Regions:
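Acidic, polar-rich N-terminal leader regions of halophilic archaeal proteins
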Residues: 1-140
């Protein structure tokens, strides 16, 4: 799956970069939030001291913002997408045409990794497909 940005997502991406100084790799606009994927190593700039950068962007765009740190390594990327769940291990396996990321999380964080109505793991699946051609993310 490739990355196609809507005009609205492009606008939010530009606003986020301008307000935080962080390099943004992707932006997805959902019904209840905006998801920003920043380049590796850009989380500090994106969040800002005590979350001030994210809070300023949320006020400017009048929406909740979730920031995910990008990664060149598919396993690291999937773990980042499931944050704040404590991911213990990720194995990315390809069988035939299908690539699946199997994720082990701390037992206490299984609900966090799934999220309300499956939102967190659903977002991880979407991002993994957009950035690393991973077809599915499953909790092991």
């Amino acid at each position: 799956m490739g990355r196609t940005l809507t005009d609205r997502a492009r606008g939010y991406l530009t606003t986020f970069e301008d307000m935080t100084g962080a390099a943004v790799a992707d932006c997805i606009v959902l019904d209840d939030r905006v998801v920003i994927v920043v380049d590796p190593g850009e989380m500090g700039a994106a969040i800002g001291p005590d979350g001030t950068h994210v809070q300023a962007v949320e006020s400017a765009i009048d929406s909740t913002v979730k920031v995910v740190e990008g990664a060149d390594d598919p396993a690291r990327f999937v773990a980042n997408a499931l944050a704040p769940a404590a991911v213990e291990h990720v194995v990315v396996s390809t069988q035939g045409e299908v690539t699946v990321a199997y994720v082990e999380v701390a037992a206490a964080d299984r609900g966090v990794a799934i999220g309300r109505d499956g939102r967190t793991i659903g977002l991880a699946r979407t991002l993994a497909a957009r950035h690393h051609d991973i077809d599915d993310v499953q909790l092991a």
